[in-house]
A protein has these predicted regions:
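C-terminal cap of metal-dependent C-N hydrolases
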Residues: 5-11, 332, 344-378
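Active-site core of metal-dependent hydrolases
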Residues: 85, 180-277, 292, 332-334, ...
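Alpha-helical scaffold segments that flank or form the walls of functional sites
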Residues: 69-117, 127, 159-185, 189-191
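N-terminal metal-binding scaffold of metallo-dependent hydrolase/deaminase domains
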Residues: 1-37, 47-49
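Divalent metal-coordination and catalytic microenvironments
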Residues: 7, 22, 27, 46, ...
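His/Asp/Glu-enriched, well-ordered alpha-helical/loop segment
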Residues: 65-66, 70-75, 80, 212, ...
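Metal-coordinating catalytic core of metallo-dependent amide/deamination hydrolases
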Residues: 123-228, 232, 298
Length: 378
């Protein structure tokens, strides 16, 4: 049992921080209170304690050095929902070291946006040597993409317009729906079962509402296309990037969707991101949207997630909303808020101890715990 004493707690639940002790046992937060004791003690007097930071949209571990190490996109099939991030993530990627040293304890990582359907994202902790032991949620979402990326990557093959992108996604979902109907109608009769199709099997969890479509969409019209298609098929949806979200904030607030905003700490290298703004997270949050801030690592190095939140605060976002945008909101976004994202009894003991606000570049991360074990200390 471990007790962290006298730290100033920012639990991502209560707006105002408070001084308390944290009791940890078997990798879980056992209790938060005063006058707690354990065999092992960490003195956090004068320090700040936060939940481990969570990134809802990353590609960490899939984008290595040079072409031999790049596993982020399948370049020969525009529709490949059968791919799984867990089969490509390299836990030995040094980006994980940088991530946890900055307090990022959990990420949702997966395929890029070259394909209309790219495969499943996985939610993992940032410490470990074997991906199977790092998993929080094996299949967190099914990646789909709109806008420039599928067009650019497949322009000479099969996709040169936004209309084509939408049609390819619709066709895949229609085929998967028919496939599922045949499977359910056949029941246990193996002779009536449709021929096995790995791609269509991969889309069944989407149709059953077990995982959402994770829709890469920057431009406002692409965002609305993603919403339109999700509504047509009655499937769950999260919005990823949401670059022009500030232009349609009131409309997005009506949807109740989870939306991830970023990457913002980079050049506007594409036409569809020319309206990128640090004000976007704050505007969406103020409108009542459920907002997470993301790095899209390796577009932005994973360790700069708190800095991105700080830039959003500088542009007008409420600091408490910004904290929630890198803790409990991304945890809810990817469906793992029962385990991570806030400092509450029963959750994983993932926490960050700092000597100041994580939004300030002068702040030092003093200690990081994942599952109650120290993975970084200075």
């Amino acid at each position: 049992m471990l007790c962290i004493k006298n730290g100033r707690i920012h639990d991502a639940v209560h707006r105002e921080p408070y001084t308390a002790d944290i009791l940890i046992e078997n990798g879980k937060l056992l209790q938060i209170g005063t006058d707690l004791h354990a065999e092992q003690t960490i003195d956090a007097a004068g320090l700040e304690i936060y939940p481990g930071f969570v990134d809802a949209h990353s590609h960490i571990g899939l984008d290595g050095y040079g072409e031999p190490g790049v596993d982020i996109n399948e370049r020969n099939d525009i529709c490949c929902p059968q791919l799984r991030a867990i089969d490509g993530v390299n836990p030995m990627d040094e980006s994980f070291v940088y991530a946890r040293s900055a307090g990022i304890t959990c990420v949702c990582t997966g395929p890029g946006s070259a394909n209309v359907l790219g495969g499943t994202f996985t939610a993992i902790k940032t410490a470990g040597t074997r991906i199977d032991d790092m998993i929080v949620k094996k299949e967190a979402a099914m990646k789909c993409a709109f806008g420039e990326n599928p067009k650019r990557c497949y322009a000479s093959k099969c996709d040169s317009s936004r209309m084509t992108t939408a049609a390819i996604l619709r066709e895949a979902l229609m085929k998967a729906r028919l496939y599922l109907q045949k499977k359910e109608a056949a029941g246990d009769d193996v002779f009536r079962q449709p021929a096995f199709d790995m791609k269509l099997e991969a889309l069944i969890p989407v149709l059953r509402g077990q995982i959402p479509l994770k829709a890469h969409a920057h431009r406002a019209d692409d965002i609305f296309t993603a919403i339109r298609i999700a509504d047509e098929f009655g499937v769950r949806l999260t919005l990823e990037h949401t670059t022009e979200g500030h232009l349609i904030a009131d409309e997005l607030a009506k949807t109740g969707l989870c939306m991830a905003v970023g990457p913002s700490l980079n050049f506007a290298t594409k036409v569809e991101v020319r309206n990128k703004s640090w004000k976007t997270p704050g505007i969406l949050s103020h409108a009542g949207c459920h907002v997470s801030i993301i790095t899209d690592c390796t577009v932005i190095p994973q360790q700069y997630l708190p800095l991105c939140a700080g830039m959003a605060v500088k542009a007008g976002m409420d600091p408490f909303d910004a904290l929630r945008a890198i803790t409990i909101h991304p945890a809810e976004h990817i469906g793992i808020a029962d385990r991570v994202g806030s400092l509450e009894a029963g959750k994983d003991a993932d926490l960050v101890i700092t000597d100041g606000s994580p939004f300030e570049v002068s702040t030092t991360v003093r200690r990081v715990l994942i599952g109650g074990k120290t993975v970084h200390a200075v």
